[in-house]
UniProtKB/Swiss-Prot annotation:
NCBIfam families: NDH_I_M. Its EC number is 7.1.1.-. This is NAD(P)H-quinone oxidoreductase chain 4, chloroplastic. One of its GO terms (molecular function) is NADH dehydrogenase (ubiquinone) activity. It catalyses: a plastoquinone + NADH + (n+1) H(+)(in) = a plastoquinol + NAD(+) + n H(+)(out); a plastoquinone + NADPH + (n+1) H(+)(in) = a plastoquinol + NADP(+) + n H(+)(out). Pfam families: Proton_antipo_M (PF00361). One of its GO terms (cellular component) is chloroplast thylakoid membrane. It is a multi-pass membrane protein. It is found in: Plastid, Chloroplast thylakoid membrane. The chain crosses the membrane at residues 4-24, 35-55, 87-107, 134-154, 167-187, 211-231, 242-262, 272-292, 305-325, 330-350, 386-406, 416-436, 462-482. It comes from Crucihimalaya wallichii. Its main location: plastid. Belongs to the complex I subunit 4 family. GO terms for biological process: ATP synthesis coupled electron transport; electron transport coupled proton transport.
Length: 500
């Protein structure tokens, strides 16, 4: 056990520091913004330092572990720890949240509350990724929903209350299944409740009970991922939310569902996962095609990007369902890759909206000459989204393909069919992404808005775009930087139960 409570400090620091904003001037928007950015940068540096000097990549076991008795009455522990599966998502959370606070500079209404909610969301997300106790995981999972709901309902488009209500109904409703699963799995077959994830990983259950647990957790994580048909909250939410909130949703929140699928469904319930994986494979394949074919019909720019996120999450589901070393590694790489790409596209969509106050693609056109820097960045990041070689998305999707090909679980005909359908989805992706760029930047200038300001990307926006682009290219050129973090943990998960 680590002597210094690194993870506790990393989890508690953002929300604690955010609470001090109550003492800052009410109208001091610049003070609030720079204070929040300073907190995020300090948190990211602290996280990076703690991981660089204390995390051993060749060790698949839990590291920086903390185990404190929290509530004596119900034998509840504050258990924290990281491994190769969670370290990437925690660093991604820190990076995207820091950039999202910088992207939120134009927010002036209730900026103190806005930035506090972002920091509270930050704590909840890192807490979810670093929890080693099932009940603590559930508490952090729920804690993160509260600031998200308020960010959605108070800042955004005209239908923001509708989208926020839809979001909370879906996520809070699915959390009931998560809570039932947590209580059921902890109380089974033991005189004392066991919530420790390390002990639960070695627990075995009757087949029927394991299937019931699996379904409960699957529903909760399918809503967050999202997996069709539980995805309908996502386009509405992205369509109405402020773009800095969209960056956090696409970059981090969706990845929590995929993380839960691996951490709980795959690691704790291996036999049920082996039984359900063919069905998940089918759903993931349908999801790629469905979202890629639905996206071109969306007039709203942010909704079109949201459907592209649904399509890309299909690759993660397929990688998890392949039950192979390359497949799971590819899924983890896609989690990180899409975190950057999704956040970048929503940021650029937001910067365009700041200038023309339009979200409907058929009302745009001919902006390439007026805003060449934004046009260039949007084009490059669209290429990243359609998995151009040299970008992170290409490597992730390619490794997922290898995962399906090398899988021992599926017949050759099944594998050929799945790869064929995935290939169709990859062909549809350039259609909706390139048509989106064409409608925005090419053709005649259709914009008819009074007093619109056509100034190009400023230093802040250019810095933000390049900051997200660099890791996308870096991972595309050298994916082993991410894969080496998780490879030992992936082998540890897969060695437990498959085909043994």
């Amino acid at each position: 056990m680590n002597d210094f409570p690194w993870l506790t400090i990393i989890v508690v620091f953002p929300i604690s520091a955010g609470s001090l904003m109550l003492f800052l001037p009410h109208r001091g928007n610049k003070v609030n913004k720079w204070y929040t950015i300073s907190i995020c940068i300090l948190e990211l540096l602290l996280t990076t330092y703690a991981f660089c000097y204390n995390f051993k990549m060749d060790d698949p076991l839990i590291q920086l572990s903390e185990d404190y008795k929290w509530i004596n009455f119900c034998d509840f522990y504050w258990r924290m720890g990281i491994d190769g599966l969670s370290i990437g998502t925690i660093l991604l959370t820190g990076f995207i949240t820091t950039l999202a606070t910088l992207a939120a500079f134009p927010v002036t209404r209730d900026s103190r509350l806005f930035h506090f909610l972002m920091l509270a969301m930050y704590s909840g997300q890192i807490g979810s990724f670093s929890s080693r106790d099932l009940l603590l995981f559930f508490i952090m999972w729920e804690l993160e929903l509260i600031p998200v709901y308020h960010l959605l309902s108070m800042w955004g488009g005209k239908k923001r209350l509708y989208s926020a209500t839809k979001f909370i109904l879906y996520t809070a409703g699915s959390s009931i299944f998560l809570l039932i699963g947590v209580l059921g799995i902890s109380l089974y077959g033991s005189n004392e409740p066991t919530l420790n994830l390390e002990l639960l990983a070695n627990q075995s259950y009757p087949v029927t009970l394991e299937i019931l647990f699996y379904i409960g957790f699957l529903i909760a994580f399918a809503v967050k991922s999202p997996i069709i048909p539980l995805h309908t909250w996502l386009p509405d939410t992205h369509g109405e939310a402020h773009y800095s909130t969209c960056m956090l949703l696409a970059g981090i929140l969706l990845k929590m569902g995929a993380y839960g699928l691996v951490r709980i469904n795959m690691e704790l319930l291996p036999h049920a996962h082996s039984m359900f994986s063919p069905w998940l494979m089918v759903v993931g394949t349908i999801q790629i095609i469905y979202a890629a074919s639905t996206s071109p019909g969306q007039r709203n720019l942010k909704k079109r990007i949201a459907y592209s996120s649904v399509s890309h999450m299909g690759f993660i589901i397929i990688g998890i369902s392949s039950i192979t070393d390359p497949g799971l590694n590819g899924a983890i790489l896609q989690i990180i890759s899409h975190g950057f790409i999704g956040a970048a596209l929503f940021f650029l969509a937001g910067t365009s909206y700041d200038r023309i106050r339009l979200v409907y693609l058929d009302e745009m056109g001919g902006m390439a000459i007026s805003i060449p820097k934004i046009f260039t960045m949007f084009t490059i990041l669209s290429m990243a989204s359609l998995a151009l070689p040299g970008m992170s998305g290409f490597v992730a999707e390619l490794i997922v393909f290898f995962g399906i090909i090398t899988s021992q679980k599926y017949f050759v005909i099944s594998k050929i069919f799945i790869i064929f359908v995935m290939a169709i989805g990859m062909i549809l992706t350039p259609i909706y992404l390139l048509s989106m760029s064409r409608q925005m930047f090419y053709g005649y200038k259709l914009i008819n808005v009074k007093n619109f300001s056509f100034f190009d990307s400023g230093p802040r926006e250019l810095f933000l775009s390049i900051s997200i682009l660099l890791p996308i290219i870096g991972i595309g050129i050298y994916p082993d930087f991410v894969l080496s973090l998780a490879s030992d943990k992936v082998e540890s998960i897969l060695s437990n139960y498959f085909y043994g």
